[in-house]
Amino acid sequence: MKLGNLVKDHWIDGDGDGTVLTSAVSGSPVASITSKGLDFADMLQHARTVGGSNLRRYTFHERALMLKALAQCLMEHKVELYELSTQTGATRQDSWIDIDGGISTLFVFSSKGRREMPNSHVYLDGPPEALSRTGTFVGQHICTPKLGVAIHINAFNFPCWGMLEKLAPALLAGVPAIVKPASSTAYLTELMVRRILASGILPKGALQLICGSVGDLFDHLDCQDTVAFTGSKATAEFLQQHPRVIAESVAFTAETDSLNSSILGPDAVPGTPEFELFVKEVTREMTSKAGQKCTAIRRIIAPASLASELVSALSESLGKVRIGNPAMKDVDMGALASQGQREEVGDRVKLLSREADIV
């Protein structure tokens, strides 16, 4: 199966055979992916002229209700999304974070849009400001939708939630989106987008999808566009230095290379609730999504006096984790998202083992 690209409200296959995507569990082919031959400039123009115009016709409340309807629609397709999610190496609990978590984000933004935003096309940013003594000169800040496109470049670890957490605020703001999922798990994103398009809830041009390379997309950005990137620091810096991004002052936000830590206090000795909680949470974060969450604990800091006992407790806790096919109910941790991720983790373990012992 070749993944489709959603271009100007139609599914388009990229040219050529594309790159084969394999199951994280079995290694068997799941789909092929390519975006060769797409007219990225035309996609941007369609989003600006058709998608943006259509979205701006609605009020904040009306767009918020779209998000609610979209969430309700996706709830009806959870079974097939969960089934396909296992191919990414995700257990049912992992998929719950990704799929149900993403859908919940739609509900949250829908609720906030109706509670915190006006039922109008303009958002007033604060009260009027008197700029003269007599009150004849008054200023008022307002917020209106940008006239560009929201470019969303997403990571491999959350193919559903990663898309929906960015898509929800963009649509609520009245800005169309072009989504580029990470290739290794793009087949799950593509399925969700297919269900979104089929629902007919979003107006034409509001959402487009690129499965594969973004090609020369960045060459056609302008000052009204925004880029939201999730991935490595190196890639983010490379994209931020694109001549067009600099020349047009394109708004660019990036979430990169999370290095979250958990610190054990010197008074949290073995036998205390704090010590047990520390071990429990470190184990959870090391095994949830096979340790691939952006919020995973990657640095464990503890007093030297407690290090030996902590290592023993963590070894015992991790030894109970059942690793295997995530489709099996008795499995606690599935596979890494791709063979490439497996190789990278292996390389990093070898690097760390030069200075540290493998527990």
Where do the model's predicted regions map?
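N-terminal Rossmann-like NAD(P)+-binding subdomain of aldehyde/semialdehyde dehydrogenases
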Residues: 1-135, 320, 337, 345-346, ...
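Residue-level signal for inorganic ion chemistry
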Residues: 27, 63, 85, 174, ...
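General structural feature for long, well-ordered alpha-helical segments within catalytic domains
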Residues: 39, 43, 47, 62, ...
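Residue-level detector of anion-binding/catalytic polar loops
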Residues: 80, 176, 357-358
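Short, hydrophobic secondary-structure boundary micro-motifs
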Residues: 82-84, 94, 116-122, 205, ...
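Short, internal active-site loops enriched in acidic
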Residues: 88-90, 214-216, 303-307
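Rossmann-like NAD(P) dinucleotide-binding subdomain of oxidoreductase/dehydrogenase enzymes
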Residues: 117-277, 308
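ALDH superfamily catalytic-core signature
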Residues: 198-200, 225-226, 235-359
